[in-house]
């Protein structure tokens, strides 16, 4: 072989201008057999900044990727091993080139190059003022059309960001920023000092990790992929002839769309954007007093669209905040200047960006589709405008189909649901710590599926106010509890649910076209398993479900409807047939190309003609390679010779035998013992085979999209299947909770509001393995609608009133509750004022926050409300606190339709208000005098008893907090002095009143006696 130097492909571009004519004949590895289909642009090679990091070997082992022509074999006779750098002049030239290019301060990235140089001519070194390279020009064109996005562009086996995008991404990801032009339009004054754009890069295998980090910073990120391969570009007459590969945006991600549009395996159970929604919101103010809102909210993971129109006083915005809490917006589309600053601040506080988007003209067929959809749900014109706006916004993410399905639209507010306001959700620990331990959600959640968990969350957020629906859930719980141990059908179904993936999310991803093949396979497999399960138990279903006289039909109309509909839908779906079209072994294939090409079982797939045609062409090329191998065997006289692999189709020859090989054989690489070659014919055939492989991948991708469309055609039916399974999962979850010890079915009563319970317990505290003392609840017109509860600090007052509210909410969700017996009315809302905290962000003090909560309660309560008022007035002075509390109780006690109220206080004088609606209670305790303590210690009994208590026993709490005993004794003595002063002051006031009445001369003795009797004497 020739004595020319063998060099790595990393150096080829750096030295080619200095090489001799013989050296210039060297062929790039990317042009040889087995070159990868993803390549770098040639002009990207021109942008290399340094070759100093590249290793040049001078021993007998060749550099990876080196190739040499067989034409130089005569000069290699003295060397039976690989070639070496034995040319001193060449080394000097190489050193000069390395130094010169190092001075240009441009980063070396040639390790990504794979052969795009086939399509561009060699260019001379450029000055900083030279024109942009074709790749940079392509990047600029893309960015100028997508200024609102961060572009992450594939270049070889890396993804790169350029100019201002690179600055942003490098800062967030903490990766190196290579110097260059900092703005895409070259507006930065320093840009003239550079000839390429600044950039940062990361390996393609890290794309999913970095994407999630970028969108978490509220960035809109577009992933730009190569739209053609080197093989197609070379052999396809219809391919573009430009010097760079065509690149297109393949996906656009935001925080709202990443979870549902990502094709990656997402980490953990929490999926970004799982419960979040995208809003389109408009706000109009009438006469400066009333603000009217129109809202469309879409959750892409659940495939739910919520619509709402509501009014509230300008600057109030309480209803808006409730919707923000429930729907958790992550993006909000608004018209320019549509929202005032105080409303925009609500969204800023939750890191929700406002996107100013004007209305766009939609295509005629889209307008018609929206019109047809609206015929079924009857939205107002303002809501239809928002639907159109959201549709045009979704087009960018390929999620617009969700806006055209009428069955997924639902109103936010409903007459059959109660809405818990944010205060109640927080103070009652409904979702404390995201539903973690110690919350009501944690207590009730025994769901087996992700979609069941999300539905249970909706049930808890919106308890029922329709007693018929509540009773149906309670009947279902009783039925499933008795049936589950006697039915193989239910037992097996419950086991299947334990291993069921998120069917609803996968179904929506199938509709969006973003799901992976493995995900589709497991989705079809799971639905098919449900189909088989129902087929297997048809006799049981016929006996108990298909007739309303069956056991299930009699016990639970809700379960009867659920399973009757499930049985019908599962018996008609085509998904089991679609499952037979999949090649299971290909689904499990780790090689992504093989997974794509072999995904379909062509014996069952009904659109396989295009794939089969390309496969036949590929087989023809492989046959020709076999023929070529037979010729090579004859020439080398090695009848058992085989290609080294069926990718590169290389011929392996011992180094001692290479001198007799044909001149046109091309050496690809070598070891100390053997060299590997490709012949001109095998090279052409492998390139042709690569071309057909790329065609097959392209055709398989097209067929995969058609396959997803076939599944999507059953979207409405499949969604019903999933929602019915979710509802059953929720019933199972509530049944599991209801099986706890001493849980009882609530009884609902008509007439005036009442809660009557015997030995009721706080469900959350009890579930934390704390021994909880049960208490009775007596609230009704006869037993008092207003309960004023006094007692020592830490005596259990707040726990008791929370207990009443939690039992009410659990009962109206449709769950059994912890009590021996409970009878209650239906409540339309539960309003709370519990705890003390300020709002530093809004500049509100503790007392102002307290008063704002009271105002909210006064505006929203009615006769069917349950109010929890915990120590109102504690945020201000004692006299003001007493006055406000007194005024509140008097106000409610004089209402003709007074709601049920639980009022805890440390102001015992409030219990002296006279009203037939008021009952006084206190949390019981036992006093104990201990040695060395001036104050009375208290043993809490946590039992509710009638009557008032006049001491809060704050010293006892100070002791529990382990304050120094001397400090507590001093505090007690001061407290006693103040108490005596207060008693003396009251006595003086009484004496003064007596004196004034007795000295009055202008009234009769009878009137004097009446006034004396009216004095408040204790």
Swiss-Prot record:
GO terms for cellular component: cytoplasm; MutSbeta complex; nucleus. Residues 105-117 have a biased composition (Acidic residues). GO terms for molecular function: ATP binding; ATP-dependent DNA damage sensor activity; DNA insertion or deletion binding; double-strand/single-strand DNA junction binding; double-stranded DNA binding. Residues 48-60 have a biased composition (Polar residues). Keywords: ATP-binding, DNA damage, DNA repair, DNA-binding, Nucleotide-binding, Nucleus. Residues 126-256 are annotated as: Mispair-binding domain. It is found in: Nucleus. Residues 64-82 have a biased composition (Low complexity). It comes from the Eukaryota. The PIP box serves as a PCNA(POL30)-recognition and -binding motif. Heterodimer consisting of MSH2-MSH3 (MutS beta). Forms a ternary complex with either MutL alpha (MLH1-PMS1) or MutL beta (MLH1-MLH3). MutS beta interacts with proliferating cell nuclear antigen (PCNA/POL30). Interacts with SAW1. This is DNA mismatch repair protein MSH3. It comes from Saccharomyces cerevisiae (strain ATCC 204508 / S288c) (Baker's yeast).
